[in-house]
Amino acid sequence: AHHAPAARRVVHQRLVYAVLGEAVAAPGLADVDLLRARRPEACMCTAVVRKDAFWGAIGPMDEHIPGGYAEDYDWMLRAARHQPIAVHPEPLLRVGWDVQSHFRDQWPAWEAALSQVLDRNPEFASEPRGRARVEGQVAVAIAAQGRRSEALEHIRATLGWSWREPRAYLALLIAAGVPAERIGAALNQRGKGL
């Protein structure tokens, strides 16, 4: 079968200052809350961090996260424990984004990696919206694997953190039999993801 080339889009990222022990004086920088929302402008590939902090308190990216999924988010959360993460308000870097994600439809890796992110970051307990977001992603991954009763447990947990979390309702649709791939494709068309 002939496959069309993967669609590519350019996404503007913002420069992140993750400096341990001292603030970077730059006009217009704004702190971001990485527990509440996974902010695309706060990306490890654009982080500026002192070498001693990278190899010391923060540490390098964890290569053992299941499937390598969310390893950048895990790193940014670790960095944020040591210093607020600030982003520059204007795009300073172009990053190519391949719409055909390496992680697309790798539900067991999603589930394991995101569960590990929750386990490693007890701070999520103080941020219900953020906890619901990640719990909802886990619920989607479980539902997509066809584990309906377990998905329903995770959907209930997600809604317990925040009834406004859309991934809980998406996981419910998937558990009811709507293919996750179809929902994911529809969201991707709108620039969103599961």
Regions found by a protein language model. Name each.
Residues 3-4, 52, 189:
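N-terminal cationic leader/targeting segments used for protein routing and processing
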Residues 12, 16-108:
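Conserved nucleotide-sugar donor-binding catalytic segment
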Residues 123, 143, 147-194:
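Membrane-interface aromatic/basic loop that binds lipid-linked glycans or pyrophosphate carriers
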